[in-house]
Every structure is written in structure tokens, then in C-alpha cells.
Amino acid sequence: MSAVLDTHTVLWYLENSKELSAVARTTVEDAVRDARHVRVSAISLVETVYLVERRRLPLTALERLRSALTDPSSGVIIAPVDAGVADALPNIPRDVVPDMPDRIIAATALHLGLPLVTRDRRLQSAGIQTIW
């Protein structure tokens, strides 16, 4: 099965972090191995740039993400923020998920009909399918 990865999920996957749960890691690895790919919302790339600028993430995190997104063998592909995502956005309750990037990531998963791999408890309570 393919999936949409939350920002922290893709960054932890790419750095082989122990923060990533075993279930999350298996989900990503299985999708990549079986050539189903995993999706990363374009907003995650923007969010990573912002966090590097704010010095909350090292530049290497952004470099790994950009490298994965440009390497077809990585199995990580970008999911655009498009009209379908905008149409799905009202289905992500703002009172449960107040952060706009998180709402966009959740709406991307909903629009694509894929589970969202996330540790974020707010997203896990947003009424969408999640994996952790």
C-alpha cells in the first residue's frame, strides 16, 4: 500500500531515525520496495525550508529531502497542493488540526485516498486513516 508521509515522518525515514516507529518504517519500506511509492505533500518541502531557515532543523535534513524527491529510485514523490487538496481541506476539522500545513498534509491524504503516516496525535484524531 502507498501512503502520504507527514513532514517528520519523511525526515526521520530519510535519516534512518529511531524516532520512526517500526510500523511506520515497515509501511514506507514496503511501499518503496514494491514500487508503489510514498507521497510527500509539497507543503512538507516548504515547511522543511522554513524550519531550516529558523534553525530548527539542520540543512542536511533539507538536502536529504531534496535528494530523495529528485531520485526516482528513492520511492518518494511529491504530491502537489492542488484543487483536489483544497476541496478536501474542509473535511479536516480546524478545531482539531489548527495548523495549516498539517491540515494540508491531512487533506492530501484524504484527497488521494491514502493513509497518512504520522505520530501527530491531532492528525490521528482528525477522522482520516493514519498509521503509526
Identify the role of each PLM range.
Residues 40-42, 118:
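Short beta-strand segments
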